[in-house]
Amino acid sequence: MPDYLLSINNQVLLCYFISKNSVSKSKGDKEMKSKKYGMMLAVLAAAGGVSVSAAPVPVYELKGLTVTATRQAETTKDVPANVQIVTEKEIKDRNVQNAAQAVALATGVHVDTTVEGSVNLRGYNSKNILVLVDGQQMNTAWNSTVDWNMIPVENIRKVEVVSGGQSALYGGRAVGGFINNMTKSAKENGVHGAVNLGYGSHNTVKQSYMASGRKDRLNWGIFYESKITDGWRSYLSSYAIKNSKGKNNFTGVDTSSLDTTADGKEYIIGDRGKKEVMSESYGFNLGYDFTEDRKLTYKFTHSNYTWKYTDPRSYLSAGFSKPSGVPASTFFGNRGWRVYDMHSLTYNDQKDKIHAHFGMTDYTKSGYITPDKTVKASRTFDGAGSKTSYPSKSWDFDLNKRWTAGSHTILFGGSYGKDRFDETIYKTVSDWKSWDSTVKGNKDDQWLGGKAKSWALYIQDKWKLSSRWAAYIGGRYDYYEKYGGYNYYRGKAPTRLESDSYHQFSPKLSASYALDNHTNLYLSFGKSFAPPLLYQLYRYAEPSYGGRYEPNPSLKPETTTNWELGIKKDMGKTKISADLFYARTKDYIDLVTIGKTAKGADIKTYKNVGEARTHGAELSVTHKFSSLWSVYANYTWQLGKVADADNGYAMGRDYEIPRHLFHSGVTYTNHPWTVNVDSMFVSARNEPGWKSGKFKSRDAYFLLNMDTAYAVNKNLSVQFSIYNILDREYYDQESASDKYYAGDGRTFTLSARYSF
């Protein structure tokens, strides 16, 4: 049993996705809708879950090993970076429901409380965080986002989270850090398996089944995981009070009961309804051990994800018909589909210290359908719509080798990657609720896309200067090319967009100093190279809410300089870690308004706007009072500034980054019981003049949560969790987009695990 627990950041986000007494955010009213738990009782009678041990494993183990941070096995305390490990045991003990919540257990991570659960690390979203599964990139080729619900959390063995710029070893997407999700494989002969079943008051059902086995040199595994939820009314419908000419859009409409958005420019006229989500993943792995040191492993995952809004509501006395000109999608939202296949082939030779990986992530289906003006409430919301599809595909290959020469451990490697996407926009399809709906040819139907490829060489020398000093000296040379961009309308000749190439050397220099056996100091400096995303280069879109997004194939890569200074201290029952970090980005890419449409809506595109800066400090403290009680607290202060295109490109605050994050909690462990009570505070991020407590605000909020686990026996356990015990109401913005949402209220989840 481990004696100490280090801070577990964002534990409070563990159970929002499961059951709930739903809280409507419509007009301040609350609709308490009770749910039946008969299914869960049947589940408990028939099955169960993995056994719960006497104490949770620490998220960040000073004696733990990381194989990701420096591409070689090292103890986390010796690595000159903020490295954290989330273990399989902790994922189970904390009743984690999706991969984003697993990452949220790490210090410095902020996960929004939407169904998707976007991740923010030190002010960076997934566009600048490299996310891997068994070394295979999960960031989409289309826009670098990560579908966290499509990563099967029950199949995760551990998660390694490395904060700060890591481009010298991992390339352009690792500007803010990287996250590697490592999945399970059988270690011992025989067959093993697990079942996890859960139910909640959102009518949420989660189920996972897995089995693995080994026979001498051959190992295998299979898994299936799914999650279905009715969701809550997270997205409110709003419409501009005045049009572009200053005319009131609500003339003759009773607005006395309507609330406004945070900026006061729009009325809240309804909500899109509950957001129903279905995620499903299944796959297998095969491994063969040529010897104890030489292994070949193939892993395959197929994942399917869909969402839709149901039961939209209007807050207007005239229902969905007024004011005139409001697009149907304002009330009804859209429906989305995503399907991907992931292939991963890895060869690992511990004897000769050779590692090779080849992978492909293929989003065969990705897009959405938006209802058009023919969709009406009187016709059960049936009708036509417009369809946008943007499948994408990524390939990558990496090969490296290590040598040891005296006090030097040298790593040398190379990588190659290729991305592509193809977007199709059909202006009219017969049924907006069906992906396979009949396309009605329209002269404005559009096809566009593009490609990018890169290759790189990297080197790192770990130089053990003395028993106390170690230096890491290295760098990476990247060559990047964007090409094959095209754009054409139905019946028109294609327009070829410009191609270009860039190259960059990204150095990295770090030093670690052991003051004594219990205290380590480290200092790190590095540069990062981040090429523009394909959708920033080549995407064209006309959203249902108006306006237009135009491509910009002239974008240049961003370059970022990173500094970090930190300390890790073990004082027996108390552990302390602290760090300071700074990042400065040149040629920062941001979305800017470049004009107006004929109807006065914004025309936007991505541009290199200038500079962006982020700096901050992190402090984490844990203390163990006894074998039964332990506590933790951690605090993050961070500030982001960016060139503001609407203010003459002067530096201004980046309001998407919360300045203050605070987490604390207490754990009680007395076998067979384990109880965790956690809290989280996120500071407000509203722009000047914006009001809190309204839709489209980024509120400050405090959440209190509890998780209880009971081990029935060594194979069976039962868990019960409450998220947002105080039933706080708040509004926020998704971490990886410009979408706003109403936070979920009090949530309950009951689950059972059984292993064999």
Outline where the language-model segments fall.
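C-terminal beta-signal and adjacent terminal beta-strands/loops
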Residues: 15-17, 235-236, 529, 584-586, ...
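Gram-negative outer-membrane beta-barrel transporters
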Residues: 464-471, 581-585, 601-690, 711-717, ...
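Face-selective signature of the C-terminal outer-membrane beta-barrel domain
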Residues: 287-304, 334-489, 512-514, 569-570, ...
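Short acidic/polar hinge/loop motifs at secondary-structure boundaries
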Residues: 137-164
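Membrane-embedded beta-barrel scaffold of Gram-negative outer-membrane proteins
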Residues: 348-369, 512-514, 520-526, 554-615, ...
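Structural signature of Gram-negative outer-membrane beta-barrels, strongest in the C-terminal barrel
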Residues: 291, 407-411, 415, 448-584, ...
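Transmembrane beta-barrel wall of Gram-negative outer-membrane proteins
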Residues: 199-228, 236-308, 339-346, 404
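N-terminal periplasmic accessory domains that precede
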Residues: 97-102, 117-120, 132, 147-152, ...
